[in-house]
Amino acid sequence: MTDVPVSRIRNFCIIAHIDHGKSTLADRMLQMTETVAQRKMKEQFLDNMDLERERGITIKLQAARMNYRSKDGEDYVLNLIDTPGHVDFSYEVSRSLAACEGALLVVDSSQGVEAQTLANVYLALENNLEIIPILNKIDLPGSEPERVANEIEEVVGLDCTGIIKASAKAGIGVDEILESIVHLVPPPSDTVDKPLRALIFDSYYDPYRGVIVYFRVMDGTVKTGDRVRLMASGKEYEIDELGVLSPNQIEVESLHAGEVGYFAAAIKAVEDARVGDTITLAEAPAKEPLPGYTEAKPMVFCGLFPTDADQYEDLREALNRLKLNDAALSYEPETSSAMGFGFRCGFLGLLHMEIVQERLEREYDLDLITTAPSVIYRVTTIDGEVIQVDNPSLLPSPQEREKVEEPYIEVEMITPETYVGTLMELCQSRRGVFKDMRYFTLSRTSLVYELPLAEVVTDFFDQLKSRSRGYASMEYQLIGYRENPLVKLDILVNGDSVDALAMIVHRDKAYYVGRALTEKLKELIPRHQFKVPIQAAIGSKVIASEHIPALRKDVLAKCYGGDISRKKKLLQKQAKGKKRMKAIGTVDVPQEAFMAVLKLDPQ
């Protein structure tokens, strides 16, 4: 690894929607620059997790350093910083964009621009990156390069006269892409003499070496053995190992401004080396940290309970381990009368929640029950105190609270024109407020709505996809809190409140949600020997109820003819037994019943 002048370093990332071919393009680049030997190459080389390969999405960021000899005969170092493409991980995206000077905008030439891509392009423009547009998958029969190029010009506002037409899978146009990175992406600014400032854009936990931090040096130089300080947390560490990612780790002695690499310093948990933090030398610290650091805050909460109570400790251990790798995950112990012991977990968004659940079940072999996701409500009490409530069962009673506010988001959906009507209907049914509508091309329309986050966290995304036959895409951002008449809806089974089924809903929708839920539970809870009432209530007022009829044993089967009083006596005896059973009997609520809340459609 020879020392490279700053003028020959190029730092870039790839912006693309899920499935538009980002990981495949990265694979081809690694192959063409001979960074990864042919025999070691596998598809989606930079996506390490099995889950990423299966879902075809990038969750954790990866980085790769490639040595490339350009057609002008010069040797260059290209640092690819991979980015996750999903809205839940937009903070990670913004940090990895801040570590680059250029971005490849990869668009599927058969699909066109998607909402997520747009959001990331705007982030890239905010960071003043040079954007190189690329049409991918031009070898597909459904490819329409002219239409999509016009769309990029219209929607993103980039000049597409010399747009690169490529097929990452077939390797078409990849040389052209590498050349354009060298000639169009500006080199990093040469600030080797300034005090050290480096940006952390990712970190992961290694069980043997502690946390491995991926960073980009902005100013100055860093060497093995240096004592560094993380400016946001104020903690200090000594660097044991310093290196570059090619994509496998290769140790080096020092890294200077413009370079991308990793270091290990016996850091115990990812929380101590947060994404976006600034690294500086402890002896000669920089005055100001790099701008843009914020702590990732959970937006969506749900309860996770093991189906088998014996697995509680295993679940704690698994969450501890995941937390080492995922600073945005938060959790605290919780007990529920219906489910026993478990944890209340906070996530960045829905995809993040699904991924964490799936990793817990797959990597740690746990069986879990999840409660309906909820958001953070802001409650002002009678005394004027403002409290945050993320669990419906903790909402103060109407007598104790003055107002309840809920988070709102602005959702941008990009969809073919045909589905505009049905998507507007969906947003209206979710208490959406229409803000804007733009036609980009004949086949593409942008819809902007303001929606309560609580209406989006359950199944909005699934509905969006099914109503638009998979063509629509969405992107959202938090816009603040608004006051609404919200109430707590309790579900009572056989007279007992089931805390795991409680939810906070808008007063106008409470009846419809209550009715839909009681009907659903009637189908899912098995019949018992006695009649089981299922009720939805607000406070002490029941607003919807259903009954599960009792199973009956025919006690008159032995009576052939004979006296009516004999039959009456047997029936009364049975009724008495049922009454006693109802008083002391418990109702088993199956796991499917808790999942039913997630798939309600109270229309």
Swiss-Prot record:
Annotated catalysed reactions: GTP + H2O = GDP + phosphate + H(+)
Biological process per Gene Ontology, one example term: translation
Residues in the signal sequence: none
PROSITE patterns membership: G_TR_1, G_TR_2
Residues that span the membrane, as ranges: none
InterPro entries in alphabetical order: EF-4, EFG_III/V, EFG_V-like, EFTu-like_2, G_TR_CS, GUFP, LepA_C_sf, LepA_CTD
Binding site residues for GTP: D19, H20, G21, K22, S23, T24, N136, K137, I138, D139
Subcellular localization(s) per the UniProt record: Cell inner membrane
SUPFAM superfamilies: EF-G C-terminal domain-like (SSF54980), P-loop containing nucleoside triphosphate hydrolases (SSF52540)
The tr-type G domain, residue ranges: 7-189
UniProt EC number: 3.6.5.n1
Keywords: Cell inner membrane, Cell membrane, GTP-binding, Hydrolase, Membrane, Nucleotide-binding, Protein biosynthesis
GO molecular function, one term: GTP binding
EC class (word): hydrolase
Gene3D superfamilies on file: 3.30.70.240, Elongation factor 4, C-terminal domain, Elongation Factor G (Translational Gtpase), domain 3, P-loop containing nucleotide triphosphate hydrolases, Translation factors
Membrane topology of this protein: Peripheral membrane protein
Principal location listed in the UniProt entry: membrane
PANTHER family: TRANSLATION FACTOR GUF1 HOMOLOG, CHLOROPLASTIC (PTHR43512:SF4), TRANSLATION FACTOR GUF1-RELATED (PTHR43512)
Family of this protein: Belongs to the TRAFAC class translation factor GTPase superfamily. Classic translation factor GTPase family. LepA subfamily.
Official protein name in the record: Elongation factor 4
Native source organism of the sequence: Crocosphaera subtropica (strain ATCC 51142 / BH68)
